Regions:
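Core, highly hydrophobic multi-pass alpha-helical transmembrane subunits of bioenergetic inner membranes
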Residues: 1-324
Protein backbone atom coordinates (compact mmCIF):
# COMPACT_ATOMS: atom_id res chain seq x y z
CA UNK A 1 0.00 0.00 0.00
CA UNK A 2 2.88 2.40 0.75
CA UNK A 3 5.23 1.17 -1.96
CA UNK A 4 6.40 3.35 -4.86
CA UNK A 5 8.31 0.55 -6.62
CA UNK A 6 6.45 -1.85 -8.88
CA UNK A 7 8.31 -4.95 -7.73
CA UNK A 8 7.65 -4.23 -4.05
CA UNK A 9 3.98 -3.57 -4.81
CA UNK A 10 3.80 -6.91 -6.63
CA UNK A 11 5.49 -8.70 -3.72
CA UNK A 12 2.98 -7.13 -1.32
CA UNK A 13 0.05 -8.35 -3.43
CA UNK A 14 1.53 -11.85 -3.60
CA UNK A 15 2.03 -11.99 0.18
CA UNK A 16 -1.55 -10.84 0.60
CA UNK A 17 -2.78 -13.66 -1.64
CA UNK A 18 -0.62 -16.37 -0.06
CA UNK A 19 -1.65 -15.31 3.45
CA UNK A 20 -5.39 -15.68 2.81
CA UNK A 21 -5.17 -19.11 1.11
CA UNK A 22 -4.64 -21.14 4.35
CA UNK A 23 -7.49 -19.18 5.95
CA UNK A 24 -9.87 -20.14 3.12
CA UNK A 25 -8.86 -23.81 3.15
CA UNK A 26 -8.83 -24.26 6.96
CA UNK A 27 -12.22 -26.02 6.77
CA UNK A 28 -11.56 -29.46 5.31
CA UNK A 29 -14.42 -29.52 2.84
CA UNK A 30 -14.53 -29.91 -0.96
CA UNK A 31 -16.15 -26.47 -1.31
CA UNK A 32 -13.31 -24.84 0.63
CA UNK A 33 -10.76 -26.58 -1.59
CA UNK A 34 -12.62 -25.47 -4.70
CA UNK A 35 -12.86 -21.88 -3.44
CA UNK A 36 -9.14 -21.86 -2.60
CA UNK A 37 -8.22 -23.13 -6.06
CA UNK A 38 -10.42 -20.57 -7.81
CA UNK A 39 -9.07 -17.75 -5.66
CA UNK A 40 -5.44 -18.75 -6.17
CA UNK A 41 -5.72 -19.16 -9.96
CA UNK A 42 -7.53 -15.84 -10.38
CA UNK A 43 -5.17 -13.88 -8.16
CA UNK A 44 -2.09 -15.53 -9.70
CA UNK A 45 -3.29 -14.60 -13.20
CA UNK A 46 -3.93 -11.01 -12.09
CA UNK A 47 -0.51 -10.78 -10.39
CA UNK A 48 1.19 -12.14 -13.51
CA UNK A 49 -0.59 -9.55 -15.64
CA UNK A 50 0.41 -6.78 -13.23
CA UNK A 51 4.05 -7.91 -13.22
CA UNK A 52 4.07 -8.04 -17.03
CA UNK A 53 2.52 -4.55 -17.23
CA UNK A 54 5.08 -3.09 -14.80
CA UNK A 55 7.97 -4.76 -16.65
CA UNK A 56 6.70 -3.42 -19.97
CA UNK A 57 6.39 0.07 -18.51
CA UNK A 58 9.89 -0.14 -16.94
CA UNK A 59 11.31 -1.21 -20.33
CA UNK A 60 9.60 1.76 -21.96
CA UNK A 61 10.39 4.45 -19.35
CA UNK A 62 13.57 3.14 -17.73
CA UNK A 63 12.14 3.39 -14.20
CA UNK A 64 10.17 1.15 -11.82
CA UNK A 65 8.43 4.11 -10.16
CA UNK A 66 4.66 3.58 -9.85
CA UNK A 67 3.92 7.23 -10.66
CA UNK A 68 5.74 7.00 -14.03
CA UNK A 69 3.10 4.91 -15.78
CA UNK A 70 3.13 6.29 -19.33
CA UNK A 71 3.05 3.23 -21.60
CA UNK A 72 -0.49 2.80 -22.99
CA UNK A 73 -0.51 -1.03 -23.31
CA UNK A 74 0.87 -1.27 -19.76
CA UNK A 75 -1.94 1.00 -18.51
CA UNK A 76 -4.58 -1.22 -20.12
CA UNK A 77 -3.02 -4.39 -18.69
CA UNK A 78 -2.75 -2.82 -15.24
CA UNK A 79 -6.42 -1.82 -15.34
CA UNK A 80 -7.39 -5.40 -16.18
CA UNK A 81 -5.10 -6.84 -13.47
CA UNK A 82 -6.44 -4.58 -10.71
CA UNK A 83 -10.02 -5.16 -11.87
CA UNK A 84 -9.51 -8.92 -11.66
CA UNK A 85 -7.99 -8.63 -8.19
CA UNK A 86 -10.87 -6.47 -6.96
CA UNK A 87 -13.62 -8.46 -8.67
CA UNK A 88 -14.89 -5.70 -10.96
CA UNK A 89 -17.21 -6.74 -13.79
CA UNK A 90 -16.68 -8.26 -16.32
CA UNK A 91 -13.86 -9.99 -14.35
CA UNK A 92 -16.05 -10.69 -11.33
CA UNK A 93 -17.06 -14.33 -11.81
CA UNK A 94 -14.66 -15.70 -9.19
CA UNK A 95 -15.88 -13.56 -6.28
CA UNK A 96 -19.38 -15.04 -5.61
CA UNK A 97 -18.08 -18.60 -6.00
CA UNK A 98 -15.13 -18.05 -3.65
CA UNK A 99 -17.25 -16.36 -0.97
CA UNK A 100 -19.82 -19.15 -1.17
CA UNK A 101 -17.13 -21.77 -0.48
CA UNK A 102 -15.84 -20.06 2.67
CA UNK A 103 -17.12 -19.34 6.17
CA UNK A 104 -18.75 -16.00 6.97
CA UNK A 105 -15.66 -14.77 8.82
CA UNK A 106 -13.37 -15.61 5.89
CA UNK A 107 -15.84 -14.05 3.45
CA UNK A 108 -15.65 -10.88 5.55
CA UNK A 109 -11.85 -10.76 5.13
CA UNK A 110 -12.05 -11.34 1.36
CA UNK A 111 -14.77 -8.71 0.89
CA UNK A 112 -13.01 -6.03 2.97
CA UNK A 113 -9.33 -6.40 3.86
CA UNK A 114 -8.33 -8.05 0.58
CA UNK A 115 -9.67 -5.05 -1.36
CA UNK A 116 -7.32 -2.56 0.30
CA UNK A 117 -4.07 -3.36 -1.54
CA UNK A 118 -5.52 -3.33 -5.10
CA UNK A 119 -7.53 -0.19 -4.30
CA UNK A 120 -4.37 1.51 -2.98
CA UNK A 121 -2.58 0.73 -6.25
CA UNK A 122 -5.55 2.06 -8.20
CA UNK A 123 -5.44 5.27 -6.14
CA UNK A 124 -1.72 5.66 -6.88
CA UNK A 125 -2.13 5.13 -10.63
CA UNK A 126 -5.58 6.60 -11.33
CA UNK A 127 -4.10 9.60 -13.20
CA UNK A 128 -2.50 7.22 -15.73
CA UNK A 129 -5.50 4.93 -16.21
CA UNK A 130 -8.13 5.51 -18.90
CA UNK A 131 -11.11 7.41 -17.41
CA UNK A 132 -13.52 6.08 -20.04
CA UNK A 133 -12.46 2.48 -19.30
CA UNK A 134 -12.88 2.97 -15.55
CA UNK A 135 -16.28 4.66 -15.99
CA UNK A 136 -17.48 1.84 -18.24
CA UNK A 137 -16.27 -0.88 -15.87
CA UNK A 138 -17.80 0.97 -12.93
CA UNK A 139 -21.20 1.17 -14.63
CA UNK A 140 -21.07 -2.50 -15.66
CA UNK A 141 -20.07 -3.51 -12.12
CA UNK A 142 -22.92 -1.53 -10.56
CA UNK A 143 -25.42 -3.12 -12.97
CA UNK A 144 -24.02 -6.66 -12.66
CA UNK A 145 -23.82 -6.37 -8.87
CA UNK A 146 -27.47 -5.33 -8.66
CA UNK A 147 -28.72 -7.75 -11.30
CA UNK A 148 -26.75 -10.75 -10.06
CA UNK A 149 -27.98 -10.47 -6.49
CA UNK A 150 -31.67 -10.61 -7.37
CA UNK A 151 -32.08 -14.39 -7.62
CA UNK A 152 -29.66 -15.44 -4.86
CA UNK A 153 -30.70 -17.29 -1.70
CA UNK A 154 -27.25 -17.52 -0.04
CA UNK A 155 -26.27 -14.50 2.04
CA UNK A 156 -22.58 -14.85 1.13
CA UNK A 157 -23.37 -14.66 -2.59
CA UNK A 158 -25.66 -11.70 -1.99
CA UNK A 159 -22.83 -9.93 -0.14
CA UNK A 160 -20.46 -10.79 -3.01
CA UNK A 161 -22.72 -9.10 -5.56
CA UNK A 162 -23.20 -6.23 -3.13
CA UNK A 163 -19.41 -5.87 -3.02
CA UNK A 164 -19.22 -5.83 -6.83
CA UNK A 165 -21.86 -3.08 -7.00
CA UNK A 166 -20.12 -0.95 -4.34
CA UNK A 167 -16.77 -1.35 -6.10
CA UNK A 168 -18.43 -0.09 -9.29
CA UNK A 169 -19.47 3.10 -7.48
CA UNK A 170 -15.93 3.48 -6.10
CA UNK A 171 -14.30 3.17 -9.52
CA UNK A 172 -16.70 5.70 -11.04
CA UNK A 173 -15.90 8.13 -8.21
CA UNK A 174 -12.15 7.58 -8.65
CA UNK A 175 -12.20 8.90 -12.22
CA UNK A 176 -13.67 12.21 -11.03
CA UNK A 177 -12.65 12.71 -7.39
CA UNK A 178 -10.25 10.28 -5.63
CA UNK A 179 -11.07 11.73 -2.19
CA UNK A 180 -14.71 10.89 -2.75
CA UNK A 181 -13.71 7.35 -3.73
CA UNK A 182 -11.73 7.09 -0.48
CA UNK A 183 -14.80 8.17 1.51
CA UNK A 184 -16.87 5.60 -0.38
CA UNK A 185 -14.31 2.88 0.38
CA UNK A 186 -14.29 3.75 4.09
CA UNK A 187 -18.08 3.64 4.36
CA UNK A 188 -18.21 0.43 2.32
CA UNK A 189 -15.74 -1.26 4.69
CA UNK A 190 -17.71 -0.04 7.70
CA UNK A 191 -21.14 -1.17 6.46
CA UNK A 192 -19.96 -4.49 5.00
CA UNK A 193 -18.06 -5.41 8.17
CA UNK A 194 -21.10 -4.62 10.32
CA UNK A 195 -23.39 -6.66 8.05
CA UNK A 196 -21.10 -9.69 8.17
CA UNK A 197 -20.80 -9.43 11.97
CA UNK A 198 -24.59 -9.41 12.28
CA UNK A 199 -24.89 -12.39 9.91
CA UNK A 200 -22.31 -14.25 11.99
CA UNK A 201 -24.12 -13.36 15.21
CA UNK A 202 -27.42 -14.73 13.86
CA UNK A 203 -25.62 -17.61 12.04
CA UNK A 204 -27.51 -16.77 8.85
CA UNK A 205 -25.99 -18.41 5.77
CA UNK A 206 -29.20 -18.44 3.73
CA UNK A 207 -32.29 -16.28 3.45
CA UNK A 208 -34.22 -19.09 5.13
CA UNK A 209 -31.94 -18.77 8.17
CA UNK A 210 -32.88 -15.09 8.45
CA UNK A 211 -36.52 -16.02 9.03
CA UNK A 212 -35.58 -17.50 12.43
CA UNK A 213 -33.12 -14.75 13.36
CA UNK A 214 -35.78 -12.77 15.26
CA UNK A 215 -36.11 -15.44 17.94
CA UNK A 216 -32.37 -15.43 18.48
CA UNK A 217 -32.00 -11.68 18.99
CA UNK A 218 -34.98 -9.37 18.30
CA UNK A 219 -33.00 -6.11 18.72
CA UNK A 220 -30.24 -7.33 16.39
CA UNK A 221 -32.73 -8.34 13.74
CA UNK A 222 -34.64 -5.06 13.98
CA UNK A 223 -31.42 -3.08 13.61
CA UNK A 224 -30.35 -5.30 10.72
CA UNK A 225 -33.23 -3.88 8.67
CA UNK A 226 -31.88 -0.36 9.22
CA UNK A 227 -28.38 -1.51 8.28
CA UNK A 228 -29.60 -3.17 5.08
CA UNK A 229 -31.47 0.00 4.11
CA UNK A 230 -28.24 1.91 4.68
CA UNK A 231 -26.40 -0.54 2.40
CA UNK A 232 -29.07 0.13 -0.21
CA UNK A 233 -28.42 3.86 0.00
CA UNK A 234 -31.70 5.13 1.43
CA UNK A 235 -31.74 8.53 3.16
CA UNK A 236 -31.36 9.55 5.96
CA UNK A 237 -28.87 6.72 6.57
CA UNK A 238 -25.08 6.60 6.14
CA UNK A 239 -25.17 4.64 2.87
CA UNK A 240 -26.90 7.56 1.15
CA UNK A 241 -23.76 9.73 1.51
CA UNK A 242 -21.55 8.18 -1.22
CA UNK A 243 -24.39 7.71 -3.71
CA UNK A 244 -25.60 11.27 -3.26
CA UNK A 245 -22.11 12.78 -3.60
CA UNK A 246 -21.11 10.59 -6.57
CA UNK A 247 -24.29 11.39 -8.50
CA UNK A 248 -23.74 15.08 -7.76
CA UNK A 249 -20.12 14.79 -8.96
CA UNK A 250 -21.20 13.06 -12.18
CA UNK A 251 -23.75 15.79 -12.81
CA UNK A 252 -21.16 18.53 -12.17
CA UNK A 253 -18.82 16.92 -14.74
CA UNK A 254 -21.60 16.68 -17.37
CA UNK A 255 -22.19 12.92 -17.19
CA UNK A 256 -26.00 12.88 -16.85
CA UNK A 257 -26.42 9.56 -18.68
CA UNK A 258 -23.85 7.87 -16.43
CA UNK A 259 -25.54 9.33 -13.35
CA UNK A 260 -28.91 7.98 -14.55
CA UNK A 261 -27.51 4.47 -15.14
CA UNK A 262 -25.82 4.45 -11.72
CA UNK A 263 -29.02 5.61 -10.01
CA UNK A 264 -31.04 2.88 -11.75
CA UNK A 265 -28.44 0.27 -10.79
CA UNK A 266 -28.84 1.35 -7.16
CA UNK A 267 -32.52 0.39 -7.41
CA UNK A 268 -31.54 -3.16 -8.40
CA UNK A 269 -29.31 -3.46 -5.34
CA UNK A 270 -31.97 -1.90 -3.14
CA UNK A 271 -34.44 -4.61 -4.20
CA UNK A 272 -32.43 -7.49 -2.78
CA UNK A 273 -31.57 -5.50 0.36
CA UNK A 274 -35.31 -4.95 0.82
CA UNK A 275 -35.85 -8.66 0.26
CA UNK A 276 -33.39 -9.52 3.05
CA UNK A 277 -34.92 -6.91 5.35
CA UNK A 278 -38.44 -8.19 4.69
CA UNK A 279 -37.50 -11.81 5.34
CA UNK A 280 -35.53 -11.06 8.49
CA UNK A 281 -37.94 -8.65 10.20
CA UNK A 282 -41.45 -9.00 8.75
CA UNK A 283 -41.84 -12.77 8.45
CA UNK A 284 -41.88 -15.57 11.01
CA UNK A 285 -41.01 -19.19 10.36
CA UNK A 286 -44.09 -21.42 10.93
CA UNK A 287 -42.24 -24.42 12.41
CA UNK A 288 -41.02 -24.08 16.01
CA UNK A 289 -38.41 -26.87 15.81
CA UNK A 290 -36.13 -24.77 13.59
CA UNK A 291 -36.48 -21.95 16.08
CA UNK A 292 -35.41 -24.26 18.91
CA UNK A 293 -32.31 -25.38 17.02
CA UNK A 294 -31.39 -21.76 16.42
CA UNK A 295 -30.98 -21.11 20.14
CA UNK A 296 -28.13 -23.62 20.34
CA UNK A 297 -26.00 -21.62 17.94
CA UNK A 298 -25.69 -18.33 19.82
CA UNK A 299 -22.10 -17.09 19.28
CA UNK A 300 -20.29 -15.88 22.38
CA UNK A 301 -19.19 -12.52 20.98
CA UNK A 302 -19.20 -9.04 22.46
CA UNK A 303 -21.95 -6.75 21.21
CA UNK A 304 -20.18 -3.48 22.06
CA UNK A 305 -18.09 -3.38 18.87
CA UNK A 306 -21.07 -4.33 16.75
CA UNK A 307 -23.22 -1.64 18.40
CA UNK A 308 -20.66 1.10 17.77
CA UNK A 309 -20.15 0.03 14.15
CA UNK A 310 -23.90 -0.16 13.64
CA UNK A 311 -24.32 3.41 14.87
CA UNK A 312 -21.64 4.60 12.45
CA UNK A 313 -23.17 2.56 9.62
CA UNK A 314 -26.55 4.25 9.97
CA UNK A 315 -26.19 7.70 11.58
CA UNK A 316 -23.36 9.53 9.78
CA UNK A 317 -25.46 11.45 7.23
CA UNK A 318 -25.83 14.65 9.36
CA UNK A 319 -22.04 15.07 9.56
CA UNK A 320 -21.44 14.71 5.80
CA UNK A 321 -19.71 18.15 5.49
CA UNK A 322 -17.14 17.04 8.10
CA UNK A 323 -16.33 13.90 6.09
CA UNK A 324 -15.45 15.77 2.89
Amino acid sequence: MSSTHWLMAWVGLELNTLAIIPIITKHHHPRSTEATTKYFLTQAAASTMLLFASTMNAWHTGTWDISQLTNQPACIMLTMALSMKLGLAPLHFWLPEVLQGTSLSTALIIATWQKLAPMALMFLTHNSLSPSTLLTMGMISALVGGWGGLNQTQTRKIMAFSSIAHLGWMVVAMTLNPRLALLNLTLYLLMTTTTFIMLMRTTSKTIKDLTTATTLSPPTTALMMTLLMSMGGLPPLTGFIPKWLILQELNDHNFPATALIMALSALLSLFFYLRLAYVSTLTAFPVTTNTAYKWRLIPKTSTLTMSLMLMASTLLLPITPMLL
